[in-house]
Regions:
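Hydrophobic faces of well-ordered beta-strands that scaffold small-molecule active sites
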Residues: 18-24, 44-48, 79-84, 102-104, ...
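Active-site cofactor/substrate anionic-group-binding motifs, chiefly glycine-
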Residues: 39-95
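Active-site-proximal loop/short-helix segments
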Residues: 88, 96-99, 133-138
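N-terminal glycine-rich anion-binding loops that anchor highly charged ligand groups
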Residues: 1-12, 28-47
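Active-site-adjacent beta->alpha loops and helix N-cap segments on the catalytic face
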Residues: 2, 31, 55-63, 85-93, ...
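Surface-exposed amphipathic alpha-helices with a cationic face
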Residues: 66-74, 118-126, 136
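N-terminal amphipathic alpha-helix/helix-capping segment at the start of soluble metabolic enzymes
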Residues: 1-20, 67, 71
Length: 138
C-alpha cells in the first residue's frame, strides 16, 4: 500500500526503528526492493530522481508501475513513493502522478524565491496528505 513518508517515519520514530529509502531506476530494481521489504516485514521508501523518471517514461509511468507491482506481488508493507531532489516543475508532475512524498531542491534559487516556492508546494502537498521536504541551500 502506498502511504505518506511522514506517516511511515512517525511510526518508525515511535517504534525506534529506521526506514530505508532506495532509489529505483527500472522495474527489476523496484521488484527486488519491494520483495526484500516484504520478506523483511519492513516499510520502504522508493526514491525516484528526475533522471530516472525520464528514463522510465515519466512519473505517471513510474507511479503506475509501482502501484501495479504492489498489487501483483502482494506487498503488504507500507511503501512511500518519493521524488528525490526534484525541481519545482518536477514536484508538480509527481503530485499529479500520485507520488506520496516529494523533495523540492530549490537551493539554486535566491533564498526569497526558494522560500516562496517551498511554501506553495508545502500547502499543495499537505492538502493532499503528501510528505514534503525542501532544501534551502547556502
Amino acid at each position: 500500500m502506498l502511504v505518506s513518508a511522514k506517516e511511515m517515519l512517525q511510526k518508525a520514530k515511535a517504534g525506534h526503528y529506521a526506514v530505508g529509502q532506495f532509489n529505483i531506476n527500472n522495474l527489476e530494481w523496484t521488484k527486488s526492493i519491494l520483495l526484500t521489504a516484504q520478506e523483511m516485514d519492513s516499510p520502504v521508501i522508493l526514491g525516484v530522481s528526475e533522471g530516472a523518471g525520464k528514463y522510465m517514461c515519466g512519473f505517471k509511468t513510474v507511479s503506475a508501475m509501482v502501484k501495479a507491482m504492489i498489487e501483483e506481488l502482494n506487498i503488504t508493507v507500507p511503501v512511500a513513493l518519493h521524488l528525490d531532489h526534484g525541481t519545482y516543475e518536477g514536484c508538480y508532475k509527481c503530485i499529479k502522478a500520485g507520488f506520496t512524498s516529494i523533495m523540492f531542491d530549490g537551493s539554486h534559487y535566491p533564498i526569497e524565491e526558494n522560500i516562496a516556492k517551498t511554501k506553495e508546494l508545502v500547502s499543495v502537498a499537505h492538502n493532499m496528505d503528501m510528505s514534503i521536504e525542501a532544501e534551502v541551500g547556502s
